[in-house]
């Protein structure tokens, strides 16, 4: 199993390390900084970061186009925080103002700074669909999903905002599972991979 982590900007190292732990030696994790690597992977993680910069670089490097193509073929893609924004079909005024070209893969509308700025970062226990125990979620300038289509399964909510969801092979979380020692969200994503092999 080969998991690619988009490494053009953002919270990359933590994701790589957490994914390696989650794989337990039964696969490899590669970082992606340019086009040509996405098609060689079995699944992709789009980490947090500054969404405007991440979006611009992904399109410029040809990575966005590759992700869209592979996602439409069924490759599992997981977007955390800024990655959630990129996978969305619709954004709020903030997204429109910055002229972000979203990937348009998930039938969701996103509020880019739903939980405020960096100083408003916080942790909260979340009830996540399919998890026996609450998941301690770390939110950093987090976005949120304000509406979702019928094909989108809501996995978690916080303050009436959707903060984790899945649409077939696409998974998003507004929080950062890689910043905790809890690997359940990583395992959840990895369970999506065997059904689709590159």
From Swiss-Prot:
Which GO terms fall under molecular function for this chain's record?
A: glutaminase activity; pyridoxal 5'-phosphate synthase (glutamine hydrolysing) activity
Q: What is its EC number?
A: 4.3.3.6, 3.5.1.2
Which PROSITE patterns does the entry link to?
PDXT_SNO_1, PDXT_SNO_2
What Pfam families does the record point to? SNO
- In this chain, L-glutamine is annotated as bound at 49-51, 112, 140-141
Positions annotated as active site in the UniProt record = 81, 176, 178
Gene Ontology biological-process entries: glutamine catabolic process; pyridoxal phosphate biosynthetic process; pyridoxine metabolic process
What are the record's GO terms for cellular component?
A: cytosol; glutaminase complex
Enzymatic reactions: aldehydo-D-ribose 5-phosphate + D-glyceraldehyde 3-phosphate + L-glutamine = pyridoxal 5'-phosphate + L-glutamate + phosphate + 3 H2O + H(+); L-glutamine + H2O = L-glutamate + NH4(+)
Q: What pathway or pathways are given for this protein in its record? A: Cofactor biosynthesis; pyridoxal 5'-phosphate biosynthesis
Keywords of the record: Glutamine amidotransferase, Hydrolase, Lyase, Pyridoxal phosphate
The record's section on SUPFAM superfamilies has: Class I glutamine amidotransferase-like
User: Its biological function?
Assistant: Catalyzes the hydrolysis of glutamine to glutamate and ammonia as part of the biosynthesis of pyridoxal 5'-phosphate. The resulting ammonia molecule is channeled to the active site of PdxS.
Q: Which NCBIfam families match?
A: PLP_synth_Pdx2
Tell me the protein family, please. Belongs to the glutaminase PdxT/SNO family.
Assembly: In the presence of PdxS, forms a dodecamer of heterodimers. Only shows activity in the heterodimer.
The protein's name is: Pyridoxal 5'-phosphate synthase subunit PdxT
Source organism of this protein record: Methanocella arvoryzae (strain DSM 22066 / NBRC 105507 / MRE50)
Upper classification of the source organism reads: Archaea, Methanobacteriati, Methanobacteriota, Stenosarchaea group, Methanomicrobia
What gene is this protein translated from? pdxT
